[in-house]
Amino acid sequence: TPYSGSLPATISGFHSHDEMNIDLRPLALFAKARVIRAAADDIDLEAKIIHLAGRPPIHFDILSLNVGSRPDASKIAGADEFACPVKPIDQFLARWESVLPQAVQHVSNQENYSIIIVGGGPASVELALAMQYRIHTECKLALESKSSLNISIISSSKEILAHHGAQARQAALDTLQRRSIRVELGHRVKRFLSGSVLTESDGDYVSDATFYATGASLPDWPARCGIGISDDGFIDTLPTLQTASHEFVFAAGDAASIRGASRPKSGVYAVRAGKPLADNLIRFATGKALKPFKPQKHALALISLGDKTAIASHNSFSFKGRLAWAMKQRIDKNFVARFSKLPSMEAELDLEKGLIDAEAEAALRRHAMRCAGCGAKVGGGMLGEVLDDLHEGAESARKPIEDASIIPL
């Protein structure tokens, strides 16, 4: 799964795609969990069943939703056909890989090439500056030189980086202006068209490639499943990270809005919710009292400027330069490494007390494995024990059963 914090450096060409990705398979094995790559078609909260596309349904006792958000410009007419959102990141990178050679070819031939990015937040600023840096670098042009590349940021907001302090806003605006990136504020996009973007003020902006990184919104399916939605359009969540509508459903990250502690949709807040969420999931499973979580009010933001410099912004304080970039690089690389360079797996079974009964725990400990891999590695003794315990006759293929079974011939 891609780590969004490394996206600007990947666009600039400083990181490879592999360096920004976290492989969930070894991580899941390390955590003694399973990864299922399938889209959830529906969640039956009454029966506690998740229906998956192309797979048997999954029963659950506790559900945790960490589904993120999507740019709200996805609701604008023409978004699906003529514009590309920054999320999902894999989809964005596929589009960028097709745009990059086209832009380089046009600019190298001194032909106009226009890129429009809709949205006035950090993501739009980072994308615009990183794209320009990469294209100019590929064309062997100086960063601030005039070229036939035209990049524009269009936002309905009256300010760039509206949720940041005045110093950070001015630093970003100065950088964009110095690098000849056009900034159109107070213009709400009305429609995405083939080759242009139309605003409500009837401004028509020519575009060879259109991207959007607007404010966050929640997909429609949680509400359709019956999960309570807050006034701001996200999953209504209690301080314990339980949803207000269902005590056995938890939510965190961009998808959730914690009552009494609304925060900007930022990866910093999502990451900080990870440990409190894990703790409360275990507490709920073992019948213990849950602990409320109150996220910090302000967080450090590091906004990449595409050229190995960045803006550091915390509340009203801000500074710009290579030090901020070095801080961002260190944080991003350490985050990816933390979930990629894993210690050796322990054979000893480590379970929270009260999670299962003593008999089940004893059985699991007898078969604790260093690898939870392909199943062909299972020893003959263990396989024989399992087969002896199963009744004769194959289980129905419609049931979500994955144990071995004796099939009479």
Residue ranges of predicted features:
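N-terminal glycine-rich phosphate/pyrophosphate-binding loops that anchor nucleotide-derived ligands
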Residues: 360-409
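C-terminal auxiliary extensions adjacent to catalytic cores
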Residues: 307-362
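Beta1-alpha1 glycine-rich phosphate/pyrophosphate-binding loop at the start
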Residues: 1-34, 125-164
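FAD-site-proximal beta/loop scaffold in flavoenzymes
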Residues: 81-111, 196-198, 204-272, 279, ...
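A conserved FAD-binding loop/helix module that cradles the flavin
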Residues: 255-306
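A Rossmann-like FAD-binding core segment of flavoenzymes
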Residues: 35-42, 133-239
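FAD-binding core/adjacent interface of flavoenzyme oxidoreductases
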Residues: 33-116, 211
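Rossmann-like NAD(P)H-binding beta-loop-alpha module
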Residues: 96-147
